[in-house]
């Protein structure tokens, strides 16, 4: 009976987080074994999320910013980054396919990520910390007064929330929210931080102003890069190696439809990204033109710098002639009607079109990665103005060692006589 009473006491402790008798703070979600042994790991957990409308490729950029913050934290304490599960993205519109709570291992190689910073999947966090509790949620926002012209100042302050919170308290005064589709997850405290500056600006606050073991930064896109384009940036970007099964699908497609293999294309790919240090221009690329043609909602806000289908095809044919290529691979989000029109104008185009079973397996994010992988290996690539999808292909080609002249190219709008081409961000080792 005494044992049963002790179990109930432990359950009560898990439900309500008072300070322990020893004076140490009790962490919600701690397991009974942790309490009994007192040997729970003291490493702290950093979680984050991004504004819901933001797409897959911008979220990959936010990961790089958060990785910089984690590296700063690791100089003082033991932290680990909890990877935010993928799901509910606007551009993932394939019907009847479950696309929520997707772990990062579906899209990226976790051992590669871990060579750069310590990372774990969200479900491992739940298992390690003893339950689906996040001690402190900080919602990042701009300053209400805005930025006044003059000297740029990096700063962070706890401020009243400007917008209505997307979190609500339950009867236990825990906070419910989206939490990547994990309905059982609760936040214990939610407050707002006004931020202006690079990601590491919040490090002192996380180290000194809160003792929370698990901290989530919501709206993390409000943080800027610590050193965009520097060695640290490229180390993190290089560590974001695509999952092997997606690379293999892309490689098989290249071989079968585009007469392209790493050996023939002089692509020096290695599984260990830390061993890949390639001289730019040393890679040749496959005997095809790679094209990323953004359509759908994108053209509404970019009517001046995105071509019509006819204008795009004229440019494609010109490039194929110039570079003596008779194959063209097209990655596009065009709706069925536009795609059929494009196919009529460019009957020789090749596209990766998964079966329903393949789509269910790889999901929209996996298909996007396969498209990018194939475009990254092309002899010459042309993308869409200010598209993060095209930006990620630029980076992938830079990592593979292709000539920048064959990488940093974009379509001009029909009315643009000459348009500014993308900036070359040179890889740094």
Curated annotation (Swiss-Prot):
* GO terms assigned for molecular function: peptide-O-fucosyltransferase activity
Q: Where is this site: Essential for catalytic activity?
A: 396
EC top class named in words: transferase
> EC annotation?
2.4.1.221
Task: Tell me which positions the record assigns to the signal sequence.
Answer: 1-21
- Gene Ontology terms, cellular component aspect? endoplasmic reticulum membrane; Golgi apparatus
**Outcome, altering residue 92 to A:** Abolishes enzyme activity
Q: Which residues are glycosylated?
A: 189, 209, 259
Cellular compartment(s):
Endoplasmic reticulum; Golgi apparatus
Q: What is the effect of changing residue 152 to A?
A: Reduces enzyme activity
A Pfam entry, by short name: O-FucT
**What InterPro entries has UniProt attached to this entry?**
GDP-Fuc_O-FucTrfase, OFUT2-like
Please list the tissues where expression of this protein has been recorded: Isoform A is expressed in fetal liver and peripheral blood lymphocytes. Isoform B is expressed in spleen, lung, testis, bone marrow, thymus, pancreas, prostate, fetal brain, fetal liver and fetal kidney. Isoform C is expressed in brain, heart, spleen, liver, lung, stomach, testis, placenta, skin, thymus, pancreas, mammary gland, prostate, fetal brain, fetal liver and fetal heart.
Name under which the protein is recorded = GDP-fucose protein O-fucosyltransferase 2
Give the source species. Answer: Homo sapiens
Taxonomic lineage from the root: Eukaryota, Metazoa, Chordata, Craniata, Vertebrata
């Amino acid at each position: 009976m005494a044992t049963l009473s002790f179990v109930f006491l432990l359950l009560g402790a898990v439900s309500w987080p008072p300070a322990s008798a020893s004076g140490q703070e009790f962490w919600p979600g701690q397991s009974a074994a942790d309490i009994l042994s007192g040997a729970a790991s003291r490493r702290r957990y950093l979680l984050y999320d991004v504004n819901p409308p933001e797409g897959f490729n911008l979220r990959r950029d936010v990961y790089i910013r958060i990785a910089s913050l984690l590296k700063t934290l690791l100089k003082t304490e033991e932290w680990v980054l909890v990877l935010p599960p993928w799901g509910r993205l606007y551009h993932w519109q394939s019907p009847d396919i479950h696309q929520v709570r997707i772990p990062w291992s579906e899209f990226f190689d976790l051992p590669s990520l871990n060579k750069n910073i310590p990372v774990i999947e969200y479900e491992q966090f739940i298992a390690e910390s003893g339950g689906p509790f996040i001690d402190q949620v900080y919602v990042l926002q701009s300053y209400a007064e805005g930025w006044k012209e003059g000297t740029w100042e990096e700063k962070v302050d706890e401020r009243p929330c400007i917008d209505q919170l997307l979190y609500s308290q339950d009867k236990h005064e825990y906070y419910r929210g989206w939490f990547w589709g994990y309905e059982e997850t609760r936040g214990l405290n939610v407050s707002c931080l006004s931020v202006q500056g690079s990601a590491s600006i919040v490090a002192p606050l996380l180290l000194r102003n809160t003792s929370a073991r698990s901290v989530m930064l919501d709206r993390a896109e409000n943080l800027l890069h610590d050193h965009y384009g520097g060695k640290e940036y490229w180390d993190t970007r290089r560590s974001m190696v695509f999952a092997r099964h997606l690379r293999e699908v892309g490689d098989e497609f290249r071989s079968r439809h585009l007469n392209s293999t790493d050996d023939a294309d002089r692509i020096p790919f290695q599984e260990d990204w830390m061993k890949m240090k390639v001289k730019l221009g040393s890679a040749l690329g496959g005997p095809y033109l790679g094209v990323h043609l953004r359509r759908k909602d994108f053209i509404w806000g970019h009517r001046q710098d995105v071509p019509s289908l006819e204008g795009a095809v004229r440019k494609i044919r010109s490039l194929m002639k110039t570079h003596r290529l008779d194959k063209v691979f097209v990655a596009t989000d065009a709706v069925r009607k536009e795609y059929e029109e494009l196919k009529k104008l460019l009957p020789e185009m090749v596209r990766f079109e998964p079966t329903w079973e393949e789509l269910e397996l790889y999901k929209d994010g996996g298909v996007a990665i396969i498209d990018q992988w194939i475009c990254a290996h092309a002899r010459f690539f042309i993308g869409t103005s200010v598209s993060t999808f095209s930006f990620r292909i630029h980076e992938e080609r830079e990592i593979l060692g292709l000539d920048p002249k064959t990488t940093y190219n974009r379509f001009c709008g029909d009315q643009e006589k000459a348009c500014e081409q993308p900036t070359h961000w040179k890889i740094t080792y």
